[in-house]
Amino acid sequence: MVAKTIDQLKIKDTHMKKIIFNSIILLAVTLGWLGCKKENYPGGTVSSYLPIYDLRNLYKGVDLTLNADNMFGSTSVEGIVISDHSGHNLPSGLLVIEQYRRLGLVRGISIPIGAAAAEYAPGDSVQINIAGSVLKRLDGILQITGVSSSAITKIATGRPIPKNRVASSKIKENPNDYESTFVAIVKASFDPAVESTATYAGDKPINDGFDNITLHTEATATFANARNLNFNAVYYGIVFNKQDVNGKLTPEHRIRTLKDVKALSSVPEVAPVIITGYMADVKGGDGNYEYMQFKATKFIDFSVTPYSVVVTNNAGATNPTGFPTLGWATGSRATTGNSRTFKFNLTSGTVNKGEFFYVGGAGKMINGSGSTSMSSSKWIRAFDYTKSDGDGFGLKTTGLFANSGNASGFAIFEGTEIDVNTDPVDVVFIGSGGSLYNAETGLGYRVANTDLYDKVDVLSDNLKPTPFYLSGTNTMNFIYTEADKGYFNKLGGIYDVALGKWMKARRQVAIELTKTSALSEIEGVFPGPSEENPEGYPSTVIK
């Protein structure tokens, strides 16, 4: 049996890119050595201000006294103040600044200046002479020590601070990069959930759907004893690190004041069904063999509580053309050819909590004609869509999904009456091309609050509505795999029913099936554990 993950598919291409990139670097270094001697410099002046990105890269694990020679001719740094000591929750005496300058990356640095740090406010723009100071890591935090207050010049106030949304997993993977920067941990819940009497004080893990990160609150913080912690919120704050005896950095997130916390919801919004995978392009002809995989988060009797699944195919030949005037129901306006959307009604059968079920073609085979039968699996709705129109809308078609180019996707809805205003309970998209969203007219495909999408802009001050795919930050999508290879797209993650959220966001793993592949390959841990990936590639787990 053959199985390739998307990561594995990229190895060869990435290796070649590294070879090319390293060759370019070698050539650039050689040319620079030959042609950039100081006496031959063709003009210009070295900036007095060293980017914080470059400053941090000077540190190699030992204290470094800074001077013009090791700072490439510079003597100072500049940045925007992000520290706010009014809440008494930041390391005492640290002035923390960040800069968005080099390579489009945000980098920050901390400067211990004692009580004077409290005199600066977020948004102050400062220039700091650091010649003669020492770059060192103290208490786990990289700092510029030995800077006097007189070396700091405030040149402006009220400068905007970027709302930098960062996944907790990225912070944990690269703690040095995010240290001393202002970040937003979005859609975060306490894990484990806290009691109503809990306070902020101490270390509490929060989860944003990517990983857990520690929310740290000093016992002396002005809000340490505040109660009624939020069920789901955005936590703005500054990342600081702790360092163990082996030099390993562990990040923690510190809000500055309670103004850094933005509540999103007070009760769980549990999806009764979640999308866990799809077969959009079997080996051979697709017609009647495409299928979608789901998992129930509770017992459902579809005869009592009906659902529906809608597939959208935005290939150039689908009808009607242009933006989806009726959203997911746009296929109802097609009269000939392939319709833009196609619907399956789920009105019979039952499914238990944690059970997989399928919707799709009547072929019920794992990888197209002549492959392993899936007829014994739980199929809630299956019919030959090459011969029959959809349930309510959608014209018969040889392919539900596009295999490349413009975007395709599918969503599951509670109920069978779908119109322009109907929101799904879960949705995924593959690709982003085509006429999908028109901001001026408000036409598009509606999304749900998931690990991928948000119905409001969680970083906006007034939670601006973003109800459609490609509106606001709703730009995430899965990718198309190589055509006609028989890739099943496994979407593995962890969904917490009690919290109504993804504790680990879904990851697309493309498994190249054969005609004899077993059901366990798309429902179990496959590929299995390895030295590189000890957990293997499991399907979505309901917690």
Predicted regions and their residues:
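Solvent-exposed serine/threonine-rich low-complexity stretches and specific carbohydrate-binding patches
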Residues: T321-T335
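Bacterial Sec-dependent N-terminal signal peptides
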Residues: M1-I52
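Short aromatic-acidic-glycine turn motif
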Residues: L103-L105, T312-T325
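Residues within well-ordered beta-strands of beta-sheet-rich folds
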Residues: E78-I80, Q127-N129, F182-K187, V234-I238, ...
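OB-fold single-stranded nucleic acid-binding module
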Residues: K37-V267, P534-Y537, K543
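Secretome/extracellular-domain signature
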Residues: R107-A167, S332-L436
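Conserved beta-structured recognition patch
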Residues: A151-R165, P175-N232, P306, W379-P527
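A structural motif detector for short, solvent-exposed N-terminal "entry" segments of globular domains
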Residues: G44-G87, D260-T318, G392-A407, I418-G431, ...
